[in-house]
Amino acid sequence: KAHRFIQFLAMLSGSMALQNSILKWCSDHRTHHKKLDTKEDPYSITKGFFHAHIGWVIENKNAEIKGVNDLKRNPIVMFQEKNYWTISIMLSFVVPFIIGLIYGRPFGSLLWGGILRVTAVHHFTFFINSLCHFIGTRPFEPKITARDSWWVAFLTFGEGYHNFHHKFQWDYRNGIKWY
């Protein structure tokens, strides 16, 4: 368990990704692992490449949050759940704009530090759900669609080693390689 201050910093950083609250993200991720490659998998490649890449975001708005009772006992998680949009918008767009005001480039700062950053982070994450279930190798578990892709791993700081991630889901590492 991380110190509360570290948990708080992680919550702020995760909020900046604009990929849903901790509860929603973890609920979807845990369901993905339990129901991999089935109809119940929120971002299943079996529903098509578009669905796995970004369609699940568009279609999955009212999906039930389940399997995260352990997280509901954490006050930082619950604070973020109640204030998700305020925290995310402030950190992702308002703060870059204000920093830009200080340096005389508010719209450039908003564009690079906000809009383009969020767009890049989203698509790099979406590559894991789509490309890493479509292209790559399956060295650890050949019977599932999750694959290891070195170039997606490069773009996502190791997250592209997705076959490893599914086979050894309790391992804190993204893969066995340092890169």
Predicted feature locations:
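Non-catalytic, topology-defining segments of multipass membrane proteins
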Residues: 1-126, 131, 171-179
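Active-site-proximal inter-transmembrane loops
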Residues: 73-76, 135-161, 167-168
